Amino acid sequence: MSNKLLSKILPCVQCRVDYMMSFAVSPRSFGTLFPSSGQLCKRMAESVDWLQINCAAELGAGDGVLTRHLLSRLKTDAVLEAWKIQPKLVRKLIKLQEMDPRLQVVNKFAEKMTGKYDAIFSCLPLLSLPVMVRGRILKRACNALNDGGVFIQFQYSTVLEKTLSCFFEWTRSYEVVNVPPAWVYICTPHQKCNIRGNTGDVILI
């Protein structure tokens, strides 16, 4: 195998190894052993009109695979916040930030969001999170969107659709080229996010 080919393959292998090691340390924060596929990232990124996006957030930014897709579409004067708490993956995102000043890495829990965004992309494994935390994150996301803003969330099952409906109107699509296949939800807020769900989830208000 040529050195040129190895130089292309080894970084990809290292990314996968880093992701799996982070999964082993904190599986509840990831939801799956495998990072998102390029097709899933593309489907999520194509869910918004990028000409209208001045400030976006990515929750659960992982190893940066979706982050790169979003940056490739982001306007030159726009901002993308990447939220992540695992130290090793935060360091990887900071390296990406050093190459692209439009990226701002936020080393905080997603439920601490206080900004306003035109789009929020979420890779958080909502079903794996405690019910109260899940409710706080969805409420924060709902309230953090500007008028006309969109919340894009992918999940591996449809179990939480009733919970999503407490905050958002949504449509969904299915991406089979991913391990495992995933549902992508494109969500717009109800007029009032401060409601209490009638599902089994307790929604904080």
Where are these regions (language model features)?
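Class I SAM-dependent methyltransferase Rossmann-like catalytic core
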Residues: 12-48
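Conserved class I S-adenosyl-L-methionine
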Residues: 53-62
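Glycine-rich SAM-binding Motif I of class I
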Residues: 64-68
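Conserved SAM/SAH-binding beta-strand->alpha-helix loop
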Residues: 86-88
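Conserved SAM-binding loop
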Residues: 93-94
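Conserved SAM-binding strand-loop segment of SAM-dependent methyltransferases
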Residues: 99-110
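A short glycine-rich, Lys/Arg-flanked "PGG" loop and its adjoining helix->strand segment in the class I
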Residues: 135-147
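Conserved beta-strand signature within the Rossmann-like core of class I S-adenosyl-L-methionine
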Residues: 148-156
